[in-house]
Swiss-Prot record:
It comes from Xenopus tropicalis. This is Protein FAM50A. It is found in: Nucleus. Residues 1-29, 104-186 are annotated as: Disordered. PANTHER family: PROTEIN FAM50A (PTHR12722:SF0), XAP-5 PROTEIN-RELATED (PTHR12722). Probably involved in the regulation of pre-mRNA splicing. One of its GO terms (biological process) is mRNA processing.
């Protein structure tokens, strides 16, 4: 009798189609889940970018006043975006630094805790002997009670580690190189006292009076003297000299301090320098000391030994307009701007 096989093959095919559809359904669910996760990530990124963009826009609106060109607006916007990115990067660095500091504090706390535990475990030899005697007494009592417990006690005693004796500090060791807060505070206090004392001495020197001899130069010399303090600047000196000279020279009545020049030992001295600067540094010019304080025993070795005289040449007060007209003629042709880095080892008069 023949059998009909068509129904069985169709059933197998239907089963395969069902499995295939189930597999496709699972793949579709996985794809949906993946797409949903990607959308969540993009949404977070968009939120961050939106907050960043809103902050930049707010800063741009607050810093822009009136009408500006498109190029200026773009340049300002780019600068604000870069500044905002720097701020965000600094925040991230600050968070990382905080985490590192917290980890460092945790490690230090654990080290300190271990150190305290180690210091508490320090025992003297006498305490160890007492503990050994007590352990022996306990061992004898237990031996009388039970022989099996005796074996267990012996095994436990063998397992117990021997206590190490700790050495104390050696008082003869030099510890001056170790950090000491009290010693450092004392050194800082002494250093501050010395600094204040030095400043008081310098202020005292600056307040001392000196007599300055100068000559108003208009082709010939007209010598005058004025008293100043060592801490006064050249500009203050010229102001006082101008008040004295205006009485005798009509061309100076309308002149200001900025129109005057001070020439000392063939060097044009800037207005911002003070007499104190030259006294402290013992500055020298082309033809002699700029100021003759504390340079009385200076010796110049030429063909023979000569000792410098006590007094230097009187400084010249000159109108800048006169100098511009006559700077090619002696003595103005010798004058040059003062350079504190330039050294004059030999005096010259030519």
């Amino acid at each position: 009798m023949a059998q009909y096989k068509g129904a069985a093959s169709e059933a197998g095919r239907a089963m395969q189609l069902m499995k295939k559809r189930e597999k496709q359904r699972e793949q579709l669910e996985q794809m949906k889940q993946k797409i949903a996760e990607e959308n969540v990530v993009k949404a977070n990124i968009n939120k961050k970018f939106s907050a960043h963009y809103d902050a930049v826009e707010a800063e741009l609106k607050s810093s822009t006043v009136g009408l500006v060109t498109l190029n200026d607006m773009k340049a300002k916007q780019e600068a604000l975006v870069k500044e905002r990115e720097k701020q965000l990067a600094k925040k991230e660095q600050f968070k990382d630094l905080q985490l590192k500091l917290e980890k460092q504090r945790e490690r230090e706390r654990k080290k300190e805790q271990k150190r305290k535990i180690a210091s508490l475990s320090f025992n003297l030899e006498e305490d160890e002997e007492c503990e050994d005697e007590e352990a022996d007494d306990d061992y004898d009592d237990e031996e009388d009670d039970d022989d099996e417990d005796d074996d267990d006690d012996d095994a436990e005693k063998e397992e117990l580690p021997k206590k190490k004796k700790k050495l104390g500090k050696n008082p003869d060791v030099d510890t001056s190189f170790l950090p000491d807060r009290d010693r450092e505070e004392e050194e800082n206090r002494l250093r501050e006292e010395l600094r204040q004392e030095w400043e008081r001495k310098q202020e005292k020197i600056k307040s001392e009076e000196i007599e300055i001899t100068f000559s108003y130069w208009d082709g010939s010399g007209h010598r005058r003297t004025v008293k100043m303090k060592k801490g006064n600047s050249i500009q203050q000196f010229l102001q006082k000299a101008l008040e004295i000279l205006r009485k005798d020279f009509s061309e100076l009545r309308s002149a200001g301090v900025e129109q005057l020049m001070y020439i000392k030992e063939d060097l044009i001295i800037p207005h911002h320098h003070s007499f104190y600067d030259f006294i402290v540094t013992k500055a020298r010019g082309k033809s002699g000391p700029l100021f003759n304080f504390d340079v009385h025993e200076d010796v110049r070795l030429l063909s023979d030994a000569t000792v410098e005289k006590d007094e230097s040449h009187a400084g010249k007060v000159v109108l800048r307009s006169w100098y511009e007209k006559n700077k090619h003629i002696f003595p103005a042709s010798r004058w040059e701007p003062y350079d504190p880095e330039k050294k004059w080892d030999k005096y010259t008069i030519r």
